[in-house]
Amino acid sequence: MGQARPAARRPHSPDPGAQPAPPRRRARALALLGALLAAAAAVAAARACALLADAQAAARQESALKVLGTDGLFLFSSLDTDQDMYISPEEFKPIAEKLTGSVPVANYEEEELPHDPSEETLTIEARFQPLLMETMTKSKDGFLGVSRLALSGLRNWTTAASPSAAFAARHFRPFLPPPGQELGQPWWIIPGELSVFTGYLSNNRFYPPPPKGKEVIIHRLLSMFHPRPFVKTRFAPQGTVACLTAISDSYYTVMFRIHAEFQLSEPPDFPFWFSPGQFTGHIILSKDATHIRDFRLFVPNHRSLNVDMEWLYGASETSNMEVDIGYVPQMELEAVGPSVPSVILDEDGNMIDSRLPSGEPLQFVFEEIKWHQELSWEEAARRLEVAMYPFKKVNYLPFTEAFDRARAEKKLVHSILLWGALDDQSCUGSGRTLRETVLESPPILTLLNESFISTWSLVKELEDLQTQQENPLHRQLAGLHLEKYSFPVEMMICLPNGTVVHHINANYFLDITSMKPEDMENNNVFSFSSSFEDPSTATYMQFLREGLRRGLPLLQP
């Protein structure tokens, strides 16, 4: 008799009457749930605190606005550096110093530039002629609409802050080149920190940050002109660049270019920025920086305009800003002679009087320096310019010279007409944007070098050229340009005889290149090209090529 088969095993299914999870697992689950709830509560509390803090800050801001008014709140905010709506003693310090007339010597100067009586001393004199107010564009209508208070810092700046100052020779050590630096190879004494991608520094400032390291000597030198120099400008390119122009066994000649600016106002006035186009100069110093043979620093004054000025008319960074340009005849620092020992010793090491019995000072005799390598001032200036402005890899000729060259080489002229100099810090607005973007783009540089003669000009200079009677051709060239010009910057493609075959205003150009690609395709004048990722480069390339298309058939064979 056979045995019965066991019943088939059924799949396991949950049993409503099953035992609860073991105590350890349940405790872990409860702990995890508690942690999640605590985290959520913390996030909610943080958000609530942030909202409360924002609400309190907004309430304090609104209350301050009612009490102080717009201008008063602007002054308060300029001192409230941490934006907590309270003025600490440290934040109030600038006002206290202004009211009491007591400005203590900054600690950085005591630490970085200590006096050593055994070293040589260089005496430097400052020469300063104030800005000619009649060169400002707003002078044409008698400064209509411009508050006299806004220009008070400019009008009151009539002399150098320090007509003369003494420096220890070794304080100029930052001008020494890095080891192995070759003749004409630029290096940065103070590197810039800004680019077209980083934007610019705040306009709403009165006092420069304490200089550090190599900035100290630049700050001290510029302080001879005005007590509030900023060794780094708000806009790129910033800093100080230098190159060797001569080398001997014991000496270097170093040429340098400095981009710096000054804040002419203090509270309760609004900020007023004074930005010279550039400071340039040279120094001849021993290779150990113990002796300075010569030093000179100056703002170039060969153009009709050389200073940009910008001032605020409101209580925030986004307040209305006025912009103008003008001419300063002289801003110059120059050594009165080579550096000389502070203490004079005889052959036995005894200190002797620095004056003869007759009262005349002792005359020092310096050996002649024999240079082994030299570079011209013009070539050194060009290399420093390219270091600051990569768009100058294209050679931009003077206005009339460009048309002479175009006739000789049978090329078109790429011309830019604007108010401020394209290759220094007196340029502003759309001109500044152009030089930092499309004009330094490699494809644009290549096409300009291959197919065009380039030039840029100040509107003021062409207006002056148009009134000259000596050269009718130059008058005609200037007139043809000014006919096509629209404020603030006009780019033109011209025949060698000055005829403008194509042109575009910079503001319009920047507007259309900020469009979306699909909007560019619908534009009747320019369209986005897939050959370049950057629409600005693509559009400027199309502008140049359209100029070639129109102009090349018209060139004289």
From Swiss-Prot:
Where does this protein reside within or beyond the cell? Endoplasmic reticulum membrane
Keywords, comma-separated and alphabetical: Endoplasmic reticulum, Glycoprotein, Membrane, Oxidoreductase, Repeat, Selenocysteine, Signal
Record-annotated EF-hand domain positions: 67-102
Residue runs in coiled coils: none
Q: Which InterPro entries match?
A: EF_hand_dom
Q: Which GO terms describe its cellular component?
A: endoplasmic reticulum; endoplasmic reticulum membrane; mitochondria-associated endoplasmic reticulum membrane contact site; mitochondrial membrane; mitochondrion
Region described as Disordered: spans on this chain = 1-24
Posttranslational modification: N-glycosylated.
Effect of knocking it out? Answer: Mutant mice show only subtle alterations in the muscle morphology, ultrastructure and contractility. They display increased muscle stress-sensitivity to physical exercise when performed under stress conditions such as a forced swimming test. Under these conditions, they develop muscle atrophy, predominantly affecting trunk muscles and leading to severe kyphosis. The number of satellite cells in uninjured adult muscle is reduced.
Entry note about domains: The N-terminus (first 61 amino acids) contains an endoplasmic reticulum addressing and retention targeting signal.
Q: How does it assemble?
A: Interacts with RYR1, RYR2 and RYR3.
Q: What does this protein do?
A: Plays an important role in cell protection against oxidative stress and in the regulation of redox-related calcium homeostasis. Regulates the calcium level of the ER by protecting the calcium pump ATP2A2 against the oxidoreductase ERO1A-mediated oxidative damage. Within the ER, ERO1A activity increases the concentration of H(2)O(2), which attacks the luminal thiols in ATP2A2 and thus leads to cysteinyl sulfenic acid formation (-SOH) and SEPN1 reduces the SOH back to free thiol (-SH), thus restoring ATP2A2 activity.
Q: What is this protein called?
A: Selenoprotein N
Identify the species of origin.
Answer: Mus musculus
Q: What is the taxonomic lineage of the source species? A: Eukaryota, Metazoa, Chordata, Craniata, Vertebrata
